[in-house]
């Protein structure tokens, strides 16, 4: 069932993205897509759970226990929906603040990475070119041996392996040479990028200590607000479950007593 729900959810989300494309609307943010997926999944589970409850109450055991689960199901679903509505805005604000606080650092790092990429790209292209040349040379040397294998007999297999071994070692050694050369070319840029990152983080730590402390306080405040808003809804959910559990307990004890009486009379 979960696989079907997730499949429908994916179709729903991709369909919503296609609608934005054709109507030229603003695309959904990742957070909105996650919320849509969670909503579809929760609604599907809720509807499926209600069907299972209805089937159970219609069964012989359900009629005998008389739990009246279906009467409480809609109120529980409403409580869960209320909890989701209360938590949603607080969580959204928390992630928006996190993204806003790290925007400058992400932009600076993207700029540094793009600069390093432009500098090392020629070395990467040269390495790829040489590697393709080595592979092609190896293929040309091995191709006659493959033909010899197809045309020859099994007794020449050992001889063929002996011929392949030095060629493989030669390719490995030549590739190692190219890799070492590439590593030597890239080392200064790697060190430079690491130093820039350390500088950015140090500047953020020293110059933005006040903003970081403020953000920490805001994050704590948001989490505290989230906890406070969730408490009433969770309490409502607990109160909604109590009648169901109590009814189940009473009905189960009654069924056990009735079964014991029947056994005693037999």
UniProtKB/Swiss-Prot annotation:
It comes from Mustela putorius furo (European domestic ferret). SUPFAM superfamilies: Apolipoprotein A-I. This is Apolipoprotein A-I. Belongs to the apolipoprotein A1/A4/E family. One of its GO terms (biological process) is positive regulation of cholesterol efflux. It holds the Pfam family Apolipoprotein. Residues 67-266 are annotated as: 10 X approximate tandem repeats. One of its GO terms (molecular function) is cholesterol transfer activity.
């Amino acid at each position: 069932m979960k696989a079907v729900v997730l499949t429908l959810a994916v179709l729903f989300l991709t369909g919503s993205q296609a609608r934005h494309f054709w109507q030229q609307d603003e695309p959904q943010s990742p957070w909105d897509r996650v919320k849509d997926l969670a909503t579809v999944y929760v609604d599907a589970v809720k509807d499926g759970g209600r069907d299972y409850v209805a089937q159970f109450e219609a069964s012989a055991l359900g009629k005998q226990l008389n739990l009246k689960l279906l009467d409480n199901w809609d109120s529980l679903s409403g409580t869960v929906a209320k909890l989701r509505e209360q938590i949603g805005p607080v969580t959204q604000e928390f992630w928006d603040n996190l993204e806003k606080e790290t925007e400058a650092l992400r932009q600076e790092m993207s700029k540094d990475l793009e600069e390093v990429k432009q500098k090392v790209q020629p070395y990467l292209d040269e390495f790829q070119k040489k590697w393709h040349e080595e592979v092609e040379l190896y293929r040309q040397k091995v191709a006659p041996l493959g033909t010899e294998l197809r045309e020859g007999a099994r007794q020449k297999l050992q001889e063929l392996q002996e011929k392949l071994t030095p060629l493989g070692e030669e390719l490995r050694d030549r590739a190692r040479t190219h890799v070492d050369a590439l590593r030597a070319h890239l080392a200064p840029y790697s060190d430079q990028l690491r130093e820039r990152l350390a500088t950015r983080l140090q500047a953020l730590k020293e110059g933005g200590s006040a903003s970081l402390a403020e953000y920490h306080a805001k994050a704590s405040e948001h989490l505290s607000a989230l906890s406070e808003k969730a408490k009433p809804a969770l309490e409502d959910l607990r109160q909604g479950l109590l009648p169901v559990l109590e009814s189940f307990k009473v009905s189960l004890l009654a069924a056990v007593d009735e079964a014991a009486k029947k056994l005693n009379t037999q």
